């Protein structure tokens, strides 16, 4: 009997380049077991709430699947034996979630907003334009004299 599950797993940030291959492996595991994937989201590297193995960031992946218990057991076992997977969470759902998650919606809304460090540099640059304009005026006055 197939049930709906929501799965989130976190991958070691040094293994981020292997995440697409891991996703493909887990997708094929579900599909070969006659399961279906209703939603798959790669959230990328995100800040952890607390350090895990002295790490402050991890690569997050969300899966919403419909599969039977044997497939789920195989999936959780593969998480357990994969050293790159830091944590995983499996939640049984009443129905399939196919709409975009809140995290992905907030990423889309931010869209082209600069990263935190970039924003700070831009603010610094904007703050410098006013004194720079004063200096230019002063330079013009000095060159005229």
Curated annotation (Swiss-Prot):
<dbReference type="GO" id="GO:0006412">
    <property type="term" value="P:translation"/>
</dbReference>
<feature type="region of interest" description="Disordered">
    <location>
        <begin position="97"/>
        <end position="145"/>
    </location>
</feature>
<dbReference type="InterPro" id="IPR000529">
    <property type="entry name" value="Ribosomal_bS6"/>
</dbReference>
<dbReference type="GO" id="GO:0070181">
    <property type="term" value="F:small ribosomal subunit rRNA binding"/>
</dbReference>
<dbReference type="InterPro" id="IPR014717">
    <property type="entry name" value="Transl_elong_EF1B/ribsomal_bS6"/>
</dbReference>
<keyword id="KW-0687">Ribonucleoprotein</keyword>
<feature type="compositionally biased region" description="Low complexity">
    <location>
        <begin position="132"/>
        <end position="145"/>
    </location>
</feature>
<dbReference type="GO" id="GO:0022627">
    <property type="term" value="C:cytosolic small ribosomal subunit"/>
</dbReference>
<keyword id="KW-0699">rRNA-binding</keyword>
<keyword id="KW-0694">RNA-binding</keyword>
<dbReference type="InterPro" id="IPR035980">
    <property type="entry name" value="Ribosomal_bS6_sf"/>
</dbReference>
<dbReference type="GO" id="GO:0003735">
    <property type="term" value="F:structural constituent of ribosome"/>
</dbReference>
<dbReference type="Pfam" id="PF01250">
    <property type="entry name" value="Ribosomal_S6"/>
</dbReference>
<feature type="compositionally biased region" description="Basic and acidic residues">
    <location>
        <begin position="105"/>
        <end position="124"/>
    </location>
</feature>
<protein>
    <recommendedName>
        <fullName>Small ribosomal subunit protein bS6</fullName>
    </recommendedName>
</protein>
<comment type="similarity">
    <text>Belongs to the bacterial ribosomal protein bS6 family.</text>
</comment>
<dbReference type="InterPro" id="IPR020814">
    <property type="entry name" value="Ribosomal_S6_plastid/chlpt"/>
</dbReference>
<comment type="function">
    <text>Binds together with bS18 to 16S ribosomal RNA.</text>
</comment>
<keyword id="KW-0689">Ribosomal protein</keyword>
């Amino acid at each position: 009997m197939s049930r709906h599950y929501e799965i989130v797993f976190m991958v070691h940030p040094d293994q981020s380049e292997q995440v697409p291959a891991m996703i493909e492996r887990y997708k094929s595991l579900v599909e070969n077991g006659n399961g279906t994937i209703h939603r798959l989201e790669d959230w990328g590297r995100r800040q952890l709430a607390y350090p895990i193995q002295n790490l402050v960031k991890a690569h997050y992946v969300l899966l919403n699947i419909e599969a039977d218990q044997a497939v789920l057991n195989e999936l959780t076992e593969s998480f357990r034996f994969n050293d790159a997977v830091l944590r995983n969470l499996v939640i049984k759902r009443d129905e399939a979630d196919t709409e975009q998650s809140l995290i992905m919606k907030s990423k889309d809304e931010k869209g082209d907003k600069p990263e935190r460090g970039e924003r700070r540099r831009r603010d610094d640059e904007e703050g410098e334009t006013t004194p720079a304009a004063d200096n230019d005026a002063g330079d013009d006055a000095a060159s005229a004299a």
